[in-house]
């Protein structure tokens, strides 16, 4: 538009200047354009005839100068027929293109003159020449003139307008080079292939030449039937280093299999590991008859060196180990063979962790390691020794192992006030009872040194009974609990052991009696209810239901009172803490435990859901252990666990380095307990409950 305006302005100046010269020379009709412009510029002073002549001149000028590019003058002259030029012109011009230049021309001559003077002066001569020229030249000139009609070009032939306008200027929507172009034929989208079948067919013809070669391009990935045929074992071994197809051949896949158990995955791989585990258990344990107990022992002895650490880990990781130990104990009982192997693997795995945990509870750890490794080492012997110990001890050990698994499930399940009472010692045995384990009764004293020594002093006949049980249970419960608890903490070990070792557990449980009846295979919780109606089953329930930690707590309580098995969990999980509360709580809780037998079962229900109950139970166990150590009454003492609730705080807080109570050495798992607390695991679910969004909402509301 700016170009058009400039062109128009230049034409106007040319016309007007030529018109002015014409008026000066006499305003001849030939120069009517000049006279017209002069009259208009003068405010209509020119005569009518002169105006008409000016009109004719204007028409001629329009043709000469370019029909489309009429000057403002011409338009004025045209519109003037006897009407005052200014008024008509101003209206006409405003209707024209609303071009400021034309409007100014129509309104005042001064503005016109100014604009014209601004235009090229050279146009004067050209304008004069053009006037003299004929119409034919108009077309040539018109090409450079306005291309869009504004209503003033009606006199010009439409042909010229269209002919010149079309080729000259394309609307934005018609110009293919313009982004605003609107396609009106064919496809509307450049890549729309719906109607381009022909083009597509044509294109390939042009593409016949290949710029690259495909030969050998897929050699690395070609399908070769000969390669798809099954490979021979030799080929597989050559390729992979072992027969990848023998899923059930442990020798071929030994490394992998071993790794998995270490990580506590054996439960899932029990079927494949069943063969291997028994072998390992045999390696560690010896007679197959004692395999189930030994299996547990293996857990204890599996990582003999590590085992001490595992036990410590149980104690150090009291709660975690409690859970792990709890179910694994059951699993251990059930898994005699399988679980044993798994336990071994997991034992080594946990022993690693436990080795770490020793740092957590150095003094307990040292004791635990000292006691634990011997116990582990001797747990295997002890299982064989149960026969030497006495016929009952052998079953007792299995029973106690079961009892321990019970202890995991139901600490009280030890079934067994006596067992539980002696069981208190087993945890230390877990720490260092193993050596005594080889000897049924003597091991008991040895264990007693750790756990049962007081028991011996406290309970003469019971202690021997429990001592045997302790030996058995200590072997399986202390060491195994640590692993089992650890495993259960990990979650996989418990289930694995439970899945793998349910039958063995039943063996132990059978030995234990009612305990054997419980399905220790799956959730310890299931077996909690099943656990013997007596407090011990409740204990198991508490321990199992609550956390594995509660089991540990309960285990310790029962350990003191009921049997060594429960205590190992305590020792593993809460032993240190228990030790502190135990000595302190013993006196205080001794009376309470008896009144609280009923309470003990309630804690069971509570403990499953709450870590605090575990602590309460654990304290109860502490006090109960003291009482239990004195005698079988530990059952009531186990209930006494409820009164010990405060002790939980005491024992965690007290964190006595290690105390020997009733012949039971209590280590300070308070530190370990804090670390292994299963609360964190539960907290993991809690975060779901505690959802961060609510805090966000609160912050939003506050903000």
Curated annotation (Swiss-Prot):
Gene Ontology CC annotation, any one: exon-exon junction complex
Placement of sequence motif Nuclear export signal: 462-471
Modified residues (Phosphoserine): 35, 117, 148, 265, 363, 373, 477
Residue ranges, compositional bias (Pro residues): 383-396, 424-445, 641-650, 677-696
Keyword Iron-sulfur: no
Annotated disulfide bonds: none
Residues spanned by motif Nuclear localization signal 1: 204-210
Ranges of biased composition (kind: Acidic residues): 74-84, 93-108
Location relative to the cell: Cytoplasm; Cytoplasm, Perinuclear region; Nucleus; Nucleus speckle
Region (Sufficient to form the EJC), start-end ranges: 137-283
Composition skew (Gly residues), residue ranges: 29-46
PTM (free text): Phosphorylated. ADP-ribosylated by tankyrase TNKS and TNKS2. Poly-ADP-ribosylated protein is recognized by RNF146, followed by ubiquitination.
Region entry Necessary for RNA-binding, interaction with MAGOH and localization in nucleus speckles, spans: 137-283
Record PTM Phosphothreonine, positions in chain: 357
Region (Disordered): 1-451, 633-703
Basic and acidic residues bias locations: 109-119, 127-138, 158-178, 211-234, 245-255, 341-355, 413-422
GO MF entries: identical protein binding; mRNA binding; ubiquitin protein ligase binding
Record flagged with keyword rRNA processing: no
Domain of life (superkingdom): Eukaryota
Protein keywords: ADP-ribosylation, Cell projection, Coiled coil, Cytoplasm, mRNA processing, mRNA splicing, mRNA transport, Nonsense-mediated mRNA decay, Nucleus, Phosphoprotein, RNA-binding, Spliceosome, Stress response, Translation regulation, Transport, Ubl conjugation
Gene Ontology terms describing biological process: intracellular mRNA localization; mRNA splicing, via spliceosome; mRNA transport; nuclear-transcribed mRNA catabolic process, nonsense-mediated decay; regulation of nuclear-transcribed mRNA catabolic process, nonsense-mediated decay; regulation of translation
Composition bias type Polar residues, residue spans: 140-157
Subunit structure: Identified in the spliceosome C complex. Component of the mRNA splicing-dependent exon junction complex (EJC), which contains at least CASC3, EIF4A3, MAGOH, NXF1 and RBM8A/Y14. Identified in a complex composed of the EJC core, UPF3B and UPF2. The EJC core can also interact with UPF3A (in vitro). Forms homooligomers. Interacts with STAU in an RNA-dependent manner. Interacts with DHX34; the interaction is RNA-independent.
PANTHER family tied to this protein: PROTEIN CASC3 (PTHR13434:SF0)
Protein's name in the database: Protein CASC3
Recorded name of the encoding gene: CASC3
């Amino acid at each position: 538009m700016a170009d058009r305006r400039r062109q128009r302005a230049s034409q106007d100046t040319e016309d007007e200047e030529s018109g002015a010269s014409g008026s000066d020379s006499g305003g001849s009709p030939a120069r009517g354009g000049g006279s017209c412009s002069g009259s208009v510029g003068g405010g209509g002073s020119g005569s009518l005839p002169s105006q008409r002549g000016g009109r004719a001149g204007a028409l001629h000028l329009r043709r000469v100068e370019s029909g489309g590019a009429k000057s403002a003058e011409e338009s004025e002259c045209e519109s003037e027929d006897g009407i005052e030029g200014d008024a008509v012109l101003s209206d006409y011009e405003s209707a024209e293109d609303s071009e400021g230049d034309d409007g100014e021309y129509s309104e005042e001559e001064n503005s016109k003159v100014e604009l014209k003077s601004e235009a090229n002066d050279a146009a004067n001569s050209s304008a004069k020449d053009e006037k003299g020229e004929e119409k034919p030249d108009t077309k040539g000139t018109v090409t450079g003139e306005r291309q869009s009609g504004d209503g003033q070009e009606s006199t010009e032939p439409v042909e010229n307008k269209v002919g010149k306008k079309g080729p000259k200027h394309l609307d934005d929507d018609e110009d293919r080079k313009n982004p605003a172009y609107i396609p009106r034929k064919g496809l509307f989208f450049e890549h729309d292939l719906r109607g381009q079948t022909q083009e597509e067919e044509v294109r390939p013809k042009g593409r016949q030449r290949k710029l690259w070669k495909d030969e050998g391009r897929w050699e690395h990935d070609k399908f070769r039937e000969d390669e798809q045929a099954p490979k021979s074992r030799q080929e597989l071994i050559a390729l992979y280093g072992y027969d990848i197809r023998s899923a059930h051949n442990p020798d071929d896949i030994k490394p992998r299999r071993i790794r998995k158990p270490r990580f506590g995955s054996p439960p899932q791989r029990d079927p494949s590991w069943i063969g291997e585990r028994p072998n390992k258990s045999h390696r560690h344990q010896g007679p197959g008859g004692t395999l189930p107990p030994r299996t547990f022992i293996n857990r204890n002895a599996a990582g003999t060196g590590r085992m001490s650490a595992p036990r410590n880990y149980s104690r150090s990781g009291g709660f975690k180990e409690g859970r792990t130990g709890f179910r694994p104990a059951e699993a251990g009982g059930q898994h005699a063979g399988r679980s044993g192997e798994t336990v071994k693997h997991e034992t080594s795995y946990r022993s690693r962790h436990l080795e770490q945990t020793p740092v957590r509870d150095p003094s307990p750890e040292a004791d635990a390691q000292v006691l634990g490794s011997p116990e582990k080492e001797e747990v295997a012997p002890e299982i064989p020794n149960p026969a030497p110990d006495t016929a009952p001890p052998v079953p007792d050990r299995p029973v106690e192992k079961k009892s321990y698994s019970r202890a995991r499930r139901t600490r009280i399940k030890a079934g067994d006030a006596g067992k539980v009472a002696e069981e208190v010692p087993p945890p230390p045995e877990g720490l260092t009872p193993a050596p005594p384990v080889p000897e049924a009764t003597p091991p008991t004293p040895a264990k007693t040194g750790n756990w049962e020594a007081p028991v011996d002093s406290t309970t003469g006949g019971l202690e021997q009974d429990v001592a045997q049980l302790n030996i058995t249970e200590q072997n399986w419960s202390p060491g195994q609990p640590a692993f089992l608890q650890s495993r259960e903490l990990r979650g996989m070990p418990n289930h694995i052991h439970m899945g793998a070792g349910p039958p063995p557990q039943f063996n132990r449980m059978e030995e234990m009696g009612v305990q054997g009846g419980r399905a220790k295979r799956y959730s310890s919780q299931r077996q909690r209810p099943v656990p013997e109606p007596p407090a011990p089953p409740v204990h198991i329930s508490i321990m199992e239901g609550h956390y594995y930690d509660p089991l540990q707590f309960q285990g310790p309580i029962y350990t003191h009172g009921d049997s060594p098995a429960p205590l190992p969990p305590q020792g593993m999980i809460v032993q240190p803490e228990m030790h502190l509360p135990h000595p302190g709580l013993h006196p205080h809780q001794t009376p309470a435990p008896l009144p609280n037998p009923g309470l003990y079962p309630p804690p069971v229900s509570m403990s499953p859901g709450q870590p605090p109950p575990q602590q309460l139970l654990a304290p109860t166990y502490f006090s109960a252990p003291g009482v239990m150590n004195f005698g079988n009454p530990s059952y009531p003492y186990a209930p006494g666990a409820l009164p010990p609730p405060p002790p939980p705080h005491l024992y965690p807080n007290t964190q006595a380095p290690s105390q020997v109570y009733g012949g039971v050495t209590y280590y300070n798992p308070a530190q370990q307990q804090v670390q292994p607390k299963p609360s964190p695991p539960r907290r993991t679910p809690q975060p779901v409950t505690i959802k961060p969004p609510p805090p966000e909402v609160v912050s939003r509301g506050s903000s």
